Amino acid sequence: MSQLVYFSSSSENTQRFIERLGLPAVRIPLNERERIQVDEPYILIVPSYGGGGTAGAVPRQVIRFLNDEHNRVLLRGVIASGNRNFGEAYGRAGDVIARKCGVPWLYRFELMGTQSDIENVRKGVTEFWQRQP
């Protein structure tokens, strides 16, 4: 199975989701000066920012990571977290990344996710990679 790449802010909601998920994952550093480069196809798990608008929905660190063409071409799908309080903008970062990078928006979950979200993502990620050539 290929990997998951994720970003988690200092709130650590996405980090806690990843820990509960129990699948191999690489974290995009919080410190913007630190960089990572992936070497295999991956699914990106990302929180949504911006208080409900499109501008600022994708964290700067994730933008910088995806601006590296090597990282961008290996992206196969995106999963977004968010807050339902933002209505239609719930999980907006997933929509923005999927559209701009031409990959499927696979799932969204609220804050650090529920047990049902964990099970759905674990199953969905496994099935997604099984369908890939």
UniProtKB/Swiss-Prot annotation:
Database matches in InterPro entries: Flavoprotein-like_sf, RNR_Ib_NrdI_bac, RNR_NrdI
GO terms for MF: FMN binding
Pfam families according to UniProt: Flavodoxin_NdrI
Membrane-spanning ranges: none
Gene Ontology biological process terms from the UniProt entry: protein modification process
Top-rank lineage group of the source organism: Bacteria
Record-linked SUPFAM superfamilies: Flavoproteins (SSF52218)
UniProt-listed Gene3D superfamilies: 3.40.50.360
Function: Probably involved in ribonucleotide reductase function.
Family under the similarity heading: Belongs to the NrdI family.
Entry-linked HAMAP family: NrdI
Listed name of the protein: Protein NrdI
Organism for this UniProt entry: Escherichia coli O17:K52:H18 (strain UMN026 / ExPEC)
Chain's gene name: nrdI
